[in-house]
Regions:
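Auxiliary Fe-S-binding modules of radical SAM enzymes
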Residues: 1-95, 101-103, 244-253, 258-352
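Generic beta-strand structural signal
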Residues: 83, 95, 106-110, 118, ...
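Residue-level structural signal for beta-strand termini and adjacent loop
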Residues: 99-100, 169
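Canonical Radical SAM [4Fe-4S] cluster-binding loop centered on the CxxxCxxC motif
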Residues: 101-138
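Hydrophobic alpha-helical bundles in membrane proteins
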Residues: 130-132, 143, 156
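Short beta->alpha linker loops
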Residues: 134, 196, 325-326
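Ferredoxin-type iron-sulfur electron-transfer modules in oxidoreductases and energy-metabolism complexes
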Residues: 137, 141-149
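Conserved AdoMet/S-adenosylmethionine-binding subsite of the radical SAM
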Residues: 147-154, 159-321
Length: 352
């Protein structure tokens, strides 16, 4: 018996793509903008809810498409108010999104891949391997479907996966998020974090004005290569060259993320080389405490050591902050996102 083909998903399509859809189905072109309004403004879950579209056209659309919204399958609340959500995507894989409330903002950290190819030594996500890219709709579904969606002020692409290894779908999701016919967000409320993926970074810098955060973690090539295999494919020097050539003269910002490990990248020599590398780039350096993960021979630096390293960078003229860990008790902090179900190859319970 031939399996029924899976319907295509409307969520994540741009206005141009929706126009192509309705044209191919023989509907008026203005129907595309109506559909966009239902998807991204009214945020419906079913095509039949799109009541300003004729019933005949809704039925025709439903033959080939579905909206593609799905609710999280579980959530966990941290003592500090951070909430971690677990989503199942169409491939059957699991991804997480983390809601981080603060006094003056409400941030959602979203995922772009099931697992990750980068396999950074200090990150749990890479330990489960790479299971696939999320579609633009699956990325946007995280934003639309968390309980706190109406409160959100900021989005960070810092969840599971390397966003620029899935550049086409990530950039499509940003396009929908920032368009007037989409979610209408300012690009200045969106930050993307990357280890450095050449073609993806070129596109991100050229096609958006969103903020950029670079996972740096060691200023020396060999030291960074030990921590991050991506250094072999795109050395930090190349990433910095592209940033220097990009336009950061307006409100767009670039920051550098630096997890500090005891005895690995915490010396005065590391601070001096980091300061030398970043000279001439208006930026912020975010120092991040390491969260111990099983089987990884890295140790977190003491709070006193973090302050010392921060002082060295500040003395060299850099705005430097130490990130406050959030959601550590529910494995939602930096480097801790993963799913035991995927790492174990398909157990029924997803946890950390």
């Amino acid at each position: 018996m031939t399996p029924t083909p899976q319907k295509r998903i409307l969520l994540g399509l741009t206005l141009e793509e929706l126009t192509t859809v309705v044209t191919e189905l023989g509907m008026p072109r203005f129907t595309a903008r109506q559909i966009a309004g239902w998807l991204y403004d009214k945020r419906v879950s079913e095509i039949d809810e799109m009541t300003n579209i004729s019933k005949a056209n809704r039925l025709l659309l439903s033959e080939h498409f579905e909206v593609g919204r799905s609710l999280p399958i579980t959530s966990e609340l941290s003592r500090d108010g951070t909430r971690k959500y677990l989503f199942r995507v169409r491939s059957g894989g699991l991804v997480e999104a983390v809601y981080i409330p603060e006094k003056d903002r409400a941030t959602l950290c979203i995922s772009s891949q099931v697992g990750c190819k980068m396999d950074c030594l200090f990150c749990m996500t890479g330990k489960q391997g790479f299971r696939g890219n999320l579609s633009a709709g699956e990325i946007l579904n995280q934003v639309l479907s968390v309980e706190e969606s109406p409160k959100l002020t900021n989005i960070v692409y810092m969840g599971m996966g390397e966003p620029l290894d899935n550049a086409t779908n990530v950039l499509s999701s940003i396009s929908v998020m920032t368009a007037s016919w989409g979610l209408g967000w300012s690009p200045k409320r969106i930050t993307l974090s990357t280890v450095g993926v050449r073609r993806g970074l070129e596109r991100f810098l050229g096609e958006t004005t969103c903020h950029l955060a670079v996972s740096l973690h060691n200023p020396f090539h060999e030291g960074r290569l030990e921590l991050m295999h991506a250094e072999g494919g795109m050395p930090l020097e190349d990433t910095l060259r592209m940033i220097r050539e990009a336009d950061f003269t307006g409100q767009r910002r670039v920051s550098f993320e630096y997890i500090v490990f005891e005895g690995v990248n915490d010396s005065l020599q590391h601070a001096e080389e980091l300061a030398r590398l970043l000279r001439g780039i208006p930026c912020r350096i975010n120092l991040i405490p390491f969260h111990q993960i099983p089987g990884v021979p890295l140790r977190p630096l003491t709070a006193q050591g973090m302050e010392r390293f921060k002082g060295w960078l500040e003395a060299r003229g850099y705005v430097t902050t130490i990130r406050t860990s959030r959601g550590e008790d529910i494995s939602a902090a930096c480097g801790m996102l993963s799913t035991k179900e995927q790492m174990a190859g398909g157990a029924s319970q997803a946890s950390h």
